[in-house]
């Protein structure tokens, strides 16, 4: 898989406990358990807390590495599924999994969005530092060890991205204007 997003059919917030992830084989038998969170975040509305944990998984093209950036928090979780190397990159001073989760409103700030993965790094859209809603997100690049490589503000708003590694072109779509953008990344990441 390239990426996986969870969409539960029936949400029972009082029964949700994402403190660990289970890796299951094709028959549904548990292969591995990965302890991720100490406990659920406290929140006034338990239905809101699920939104903080609902995040897409993105996989390295060839290795058994998976990342999970969180749309409503400054967290990226890293999982090396062949070892016990699991860790988080978190911007200090921002909401953490040990904090009280505020209720979700129209003013709740988005953080991470669409992501594309290459052999050497992944590119991800970051919205938290925008000064207005029409401003383009930042494009951030990280290596697979969690190190920040490069970052730049995109000139136009886009929500989803795709990447052509042969041409080093990033494509972004603005769903509100029905516009497709092409960004040349030849000088963005240098080896």
Where are these regions (language model features)?
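Structural signature of eukaryotic scaffold interfaces centered on beta-propeller domains
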Residues: 1-7, 49-64, 69, 107-118, ...
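Asp-box/WD-like beta-propeller blade repeats and closely related beta-sheet repeat scaffolds
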Residues: 1-19, 36-43
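Hydrophobic beta-strand positions that form the internal "hydrophobic ladder"
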Residues: 10-12, 66, 122, 170
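Short glycine/acidic-enriched loop and turn motifs that connect beta-strands
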Residues: 14-20, 72-75, 129-132, 177-179
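Beta-propeller blade signature
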Residues: 21-25, 135-147
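Surface-exposed loop and turn segments in beta-propeller and other repeat-based domains
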Residues: 29-52, 85-107, 156
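Loop/turn-rich, solvent-exposed surfaces of beta-rich toroidal or solenoidal domains
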Residues: 105-142
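Blade-level signature of beta-propeller repeat domains, shared across WD40, Kelch, NHL, RCC1
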Residues: 162-191
């Amino acid at each position: 898989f390239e990426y996986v997003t969870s969409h539960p059919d029936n949400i029972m917030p009082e029964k949700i406990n994402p403190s660990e992830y289970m890796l299951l084989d094709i028959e549904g038998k548990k292969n591995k358990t990965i302890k991720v969170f100490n406990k659920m975040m406290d929140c006034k509305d338990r239905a809101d807390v699920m939104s903080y944990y609902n995040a897409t998984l993105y996989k390295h093209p060839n290795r058994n590495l998976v990342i999970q950036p969180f749309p409503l928090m400054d967290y990226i979780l890293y999982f090396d599924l062949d070892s016990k190397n699991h860790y988080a990159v978190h911007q200090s001073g921002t909401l953490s999994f040990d904090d009280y989760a505020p209720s979700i409103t129209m003013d709740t700030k988005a953080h991470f969005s669409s992501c594309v993965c290459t052999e050497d790094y992944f590119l991800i859209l970051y919205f938290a530092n925008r000064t207005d809603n029409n401003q383009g997100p930042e494009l951030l690049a990280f290596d697979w060890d969690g190190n920040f490589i490069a970052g730049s503000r995109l000139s136009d708003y886009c929500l989803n991205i795709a990447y052509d590694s042969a041409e080093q072109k990033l494509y972004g779509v603005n769903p509100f204007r029905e516009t497709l953008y092409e960004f040349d990344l030849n000088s963005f990441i240098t080896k």
